[in-house]
Each structure stands twice: as C-alpha cells, then as structure tokens.
C-alpha cells in the first residue's frame, strides 16, 4: 500500500504488509492476528465511512478514548474485513449489531481486546459506536450502533466512535428493519457493502 502521509495509518498498513495476510484465503477473517497499537495525531480526525445497503454512515473514531480499538478498526477496515458482512442482530429502540465474520454473532478475528473506558464517555444517545462482546476481555470485530441512550452498557462495552453523518437517515433505515420483539431478526438482509477510513 502506498504511504498515506499519516503515521498511524502507515504503521497499520506496514503491519498488514509485514504479516502477509492473505485475504483471498477462505476463512481468513477468523485468523487475523492482533495489530500493534498505533500512535494517532491528536490534530487529525479519523472517520470510519460505512456504505450499507440502506445508506451511508460516517463515524468519527475516538483514538483519545479507545486507541487500541481504533487501531484495530482501521486495521480491519484496511484489510477489507467488514466488506459484505451483515448486521446480524438489529433491535428497534436499542441497537444494530454487525462485524461477525460468521454472520451469527459468534465469530471474530484471532485476537481479543480488553475494554477501554474513559470517564464522561457514555452511551448517552443514539449513534454511539461500541464494541460488542461476550464479557470482559472479549472485544473483537463485532460492534453495535445505538438507536437511543443505553447508559447501562457503560463500563461493559467500549465506545470508540460516534455517528456524525447518517444518524437521521441510514441509522433510522437500519432500525426500522429491525425486530420489535427483541429477537434481533431483520425484515430484510442488512449488510456493509464497503467500509473505508478517512483522515482529515
């Protein structure tokens, strides 16, 4: 990959190149190794742009809050990890969950991360990007985007981004196709077509 001029992104891309990760191999997503923590420029903004089949989201990543999660997110995104993955669990008035390579909620990469938490950073409104997990120390590639305030998740799920574009459009489109009964089943397939990173 050509240098981007951003030290954090270039370090992540170098790690990808050095590890010779073969994304053409079947099942590659579950064998992806843990990246090395990147050092982010505090003067820059890092965004996760997610093109779904019901619209596009732009999410500001929060390296000052969760640097390892943001490192991992840029790493997975630059690998093409999220492309074609579905939102396997969407519950109205709660959240949309995706990022499972198996599409079932049971998969992830070959590493797990501990939660990263910061005082004053809360699931206090719709549009928070947070790590889904199966308990402490099990964060991987699965994530959720909140549809409302869910402060009871604070300290259990690491917040590492916030929707800045698409909250009143794409997020609403995801929600209305979710379940009302808590099952998480969607009324039609919902998936990520393409995810990219933007730095400004």
What do these predicted ranges mean?
Residues 1-200:
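Cyclophilin-like peptidyl-prolyl cis-trans isomerases
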């Amino acid at each position: 990959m050509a240098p981007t001029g951003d030290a954090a992104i270039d370090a992540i891309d170098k790690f990808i190149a050095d590890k010779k990760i073969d994304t053409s191999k079947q099942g590659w997503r579950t064998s992806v190794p843990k990246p090395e923590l990147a050092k982010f420029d505090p003067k820059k903004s890092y965004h996760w742009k997610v093109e779904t089949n019901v619209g596009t989201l732009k999410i500001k990543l929060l390296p000052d809050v969760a640097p390892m999660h943001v490192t991992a997110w840029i790493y997975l995104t630059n690998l093409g990890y999220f492309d074609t993955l579905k939102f396997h669990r969407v519950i109205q008035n709660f959240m949309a969950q995706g990022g499972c390579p198996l599409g079932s909620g049971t998969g992830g990469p070959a590493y797990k991360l501990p939660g990263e938490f910061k005082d004053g950073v809360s699931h206090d409104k719709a549009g928070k990007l947070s790590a889904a997990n199966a308990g402490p120390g099990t964060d991987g590639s699965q994530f959720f985007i909140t549809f409302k305030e869910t402060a009871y998740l604070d300290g259990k799920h690491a917040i590492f981004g916030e929707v800045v574009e698409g909250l009143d459009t794409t997020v609403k489109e995801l929600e209305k196709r979710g379940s009302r009964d808590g099952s998480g089943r969607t009324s039609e397939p919902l998936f990520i077509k393409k995810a990219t990173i933007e730095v400004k």
